[in-house]
Amino acid sequence: LDDEVIEDDFALVSMCNGRYYGGGFMPVAEARMDDGVLNTLVVREVNRRTFLKFVGPYSKGNYHKFPDYAQCYTPQVVHIHSDKPDIVTCLDGESVVNRDVTIKLSDKKLNFFGPAGCSCNRTARAKGPELNNL
């Protein structure tokens, strides 16, 4: 993480430049696309039972309720090295097997245009009786 090295066994590492991924998961509620940091949540290796208890709160951004094994950092560069040959990395829905992964925020930015009042940092809310059953 930038110049800091953390050596441990991890069950999960989520690098977030936005709030949501994969069907509404929000691992780091404070992640923003426009703040210049890569919110990186590291979850230490835990037993299956503990991990299953963690998934619900993780999906809602409540990792902070588990400080013994979940910490969030805000680096600009993340390098992950694994001694195991079968580490699976998912990047925007694409899975790759690799031992070394480096993720860095780009200095180059993209401008997005949207309707008035639209923000990449807001949460969409369903309104109306026909949307309540989604």
Residue ranges and their predicted role:
Residues 1-134:
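Long C-terminal subdomains/extensions of small-metabolite kinases
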